[in-house]
Amino acid sequence: MFKFNAEVRQSQGKGASRRLRHNGQIPAIVYGGSEAPVSIVLNHDDLNNAQVHDAFYTDVITLVIEGKEVAVKAQAMQRHPFKPKLVHIDFKRV
């Protein structure tokens, strides 16, 4: 089972997302269910190391957002065209 710590993202937009990526973080979003969508930030290295396993795409992932555990599945990932980096990820609540 995969478990990641996430922070709620305060700033939005292209410039803010680029600054996050430059600092080794990935912008992401959690949506679905009865709750409102939440923009979050995750550590790039943690996600990049986990996404090489097939189970990352099929198993339930636990995100700890502000101390609250949220069960999600990876819905969509955007990767850099030629660098081995993730650009953005969408999570859907389970």
Swiss-Prot record:
It holds the Pfam family Ribosomal_L25p. Keywords: Ribonucleoprotein, Ribosomal protein, RNA-binding, rRNA-binding. Residues 1-20 are annotated as: Disordered. InterPro entries: Rbsml_bL25/Gln-tRNA_synth_N, Ribosomal_bL25/Gln-tRNA_synth, Ribosomal_bL25_short, Ribosomal_L25_dom, Ribosomal_uL5_bac-type. GO terms for biological process: translation. It comes from the Bacteria. The keyword Endoplasmic reticulum does not apply. GO terms for molecular function: 5S rRNA binding; structural constituent of ribosome. One of its GO terms (cellular component) is cytosolic large ribosomal subunit. This is one of the proteins that binds to the 5S RNA in the ribosome where it forms part of the central protuberance. Belongs to the bacterial ribosomal protein bL25 family. Part of the 50S ribosomal subunit; part of the 5S rRNA/L5/L18/L25 subcomplex. Contacts the 5S rRNA. Binds to the 5S rRNA independently of L5 and L18. This is Large ribosomal subunit protein bL25. It comes from Pasteurella multocida (strain Pm70).
